[in-house]
Amino acid sequence: MPDQHEADGVFVKVCGITSEADALLAVGMGAAAVGFIFAPSPRQMAPAAVADIVKRLPHETVTVGVFRDESPRRVIEIANQIGLRAVQLHGVESVEDTRWIASRVNWTIKAFPAGHRNIQRFAEYGAQSLLIDGANPGSGELFDWRLAEGVVDPSRLIVSGGLRPDNVSGAIAHLHPWGVDVASGVESAPGVKDPTKLREFMAAVRTAERAANRAGRREAAPSIQPDDGRHSTTDADRRAPTSGPDLFDWQDEP
C-alpha cells in the first residue's frame, strides 16, 4: 500500500483526473489521492498520458488507477508502467480476479454498487478498502446512504456516488467513512475540475471531520505500508482467473 497517509482527517480522493493542472489543483487543495480512469468513459485516460502526469506530482500523492473488467495481467502491467500506488476495481471482477490482483499491488480498492449482495462477501476479495458507489458510476446520482450502514468496518470504507459540496458533510456524519471519493461533483464538465466546487468540497469535508472529531466518531486509518514492489510483471505471468457476474450499469455515465 502507499506511504502512510496521516489520518487526522477524512481521506479524500478526487477521481476522473484528465490533466496535470487538475491533478495539481486537487493535491494543492488537500486531496490525498487522485484517480485516473482507464475504462471507457468521458474521463478515460491513456496510460502514457497518466504516466506523464504522475511523474510531476508530489511524492506523497496517492495515485489510483481505476479499472473495469480489465485483464488482471493488464492491470498489473499498467500499474507497473505508470508507478501507480493503488488500484481500484470498479467492474464485475470476481473474488478470484480481485485476490489475484490484490496479491500483486500494495493497495487494492474494490467497488460495489450500494445494496449489492456481494458487499457481504467483501472480506473474501482480499482488498484493503471497500468503495460503495451508486449504480451508475460517474452519473452524479446519489444513493441511499442507509444501504451502506454497517456493511464493513468504517476504517475500510470509502463512500462515492453523487457527492457534492452541499451533501458530503451529510455522508460523513451518517456513515463515518475513512474516505470519500468525488468526480462529477466537483466538475464544470466531464473530466474538467472546477476550482470553486473543489474548494467548497474540501471545506465541507474538513468541517464535517471536525464535527466528527468533537463527537469522537473518527475511525482509525487502515495501516498503509510503503511500496514493497509487489506489483511486479514477473508475478503477473502466473495464470489469472476470469471474471464474475455483472454489477454496475455504466450506460448512463455522462
Region roles according to the model:
Residues 1-254:
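Conserved N-terminal beta1-alpha1 strand-loop-helix module at the mouth
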